[in-house]
Swiss-Prot record:
Sites of N6-(pyridoxal phosphate)lysine modification: 266
UniProt EC number: 2.6.1.-
Role description: Probable aminotransferase; part of the gene cluster that mediates the biosynthesis of gliotoxin, a member of the epipolythiodioxopiperazine (ETP) class of toxins characterized by a disulfide bridged cyclic dipeptide. The first step in gliotoxin biosynthesis is the condensation of serine and phenylalanine to form the cyclo-L-phenylalanyl-L-serine diketopiperazine (DKP) by the NRPS gliP.
Gene name in the database record: gliI
Protein name: Probable aminotransferase gliI
Amino acid sequence: MPSETITPLLAHRARTNIQWFTHKHMRQVSRLNAKQHRVNMMTAENWSIRDELVDQYKTLFAQHLSPRHLSYADGMGGDAELLQAAADFFNRVFAAHSRVQPAHLVVGAGCSSLLENLLYDICEPGEGVLIETPFWGGFETSFVLRSNVTAVHVRPPCHGNGSADLDRLVSAYIEAYERALRQAPCRIKAILVCNPHNPCGHIYPPRVIQALLQFAQRHDLFYISDEIYALSTLDEQTAFTSVLSIDVAALGVDLARVFTLYSISKDLGSSGLRLGFGITQAHPDLRLSLAISNHSRVSTFTSLVITALLHDPEAATAILHQNRAALQRSAKLISDFLAFHQIPFVPPAAGVYVWARLGWRSSSRPGDEPSWDEEARLNDRFEAAGVSVGAGQGYCASEPGWFRITFAIPREELVAGLRRIEQVVGMEGQKWTAI
């Protein structure tokens, strides 16, 4: 008998993944393990209409639950009724130019899971995807852990929401992408466009989308459009344009290279139900591979309730309208707070967060720009004050001091979180009044 227990060794890829993840997400892991209560303004969840959704889901379960919903889902790619309801939803709400058919769709356990599977299918290990900075840090987890894909950074112009000179904006965008492609350390297979943008909250003008589609065609790349915040718009003047609504053939673009991601996590405030949609309208082999990878990954309970909701356009429209109204109120509240304290921020046109330079006064040298170390220390001070926000370095921001602040939380928590931020970065004892 051996005198001591020997722990079996994990595979090299598992050990490599653990090392990468703990280094990349050490702060988030520490926060999850912490016992001190913090106002969570880091996680991009949508609490704006949770009570309304719970009531709606209870009713739908009571009306539609049957013994068959305790079985595996039928069909490849997802439950047939859900695929039909989703196709109708995309055609109606996203104004699809080429009608979305159930055979174009695959359901999975959220957008991240589908993106991970997609990258595994289109990229060889070590190949790259062009992605604009700053970007949500969770994208890298989908890139790295299974597929070993490299995120190749693109630094486009900061255009906010709209531009007075659209021609110049389009030109600057394409120049930034061409430069990143030329300088890439690996072969590039795709571009990933997050529209509306995470974390900046801007919406891409149609002409920028069209130019990026043509860029992808010119360089034989896949065009991946993550549209998870598509219906969480905040600015009535800035309309969202889905890639599904664009006549790509008229641009000389092959529809087979276009892939769209969507989920119920944000617009329907249901991140815990784990349901996302992948749409490929002219690449049946890709659709089949994704269907195989995601077979029976979505709970039939989730399929049941979302199928019933999407089958009722009036109910779905009402929920989405309530969501937008609630998000607009919260966005105004946090924008007023930032403006009161003269903190630079990007006015969000969509999403559940704001991109703000909370660290603009954190430099130890008056008048100088803050450093990355100072950003990290400021983040520690936020944590100590009982509020969690997303520091810009985790989003590959180009300059220190930026933070992503989620505002789609209950109003009492939102005000409490802003008070704690105020304690850390407030100026000369000024106290903002919530209206």
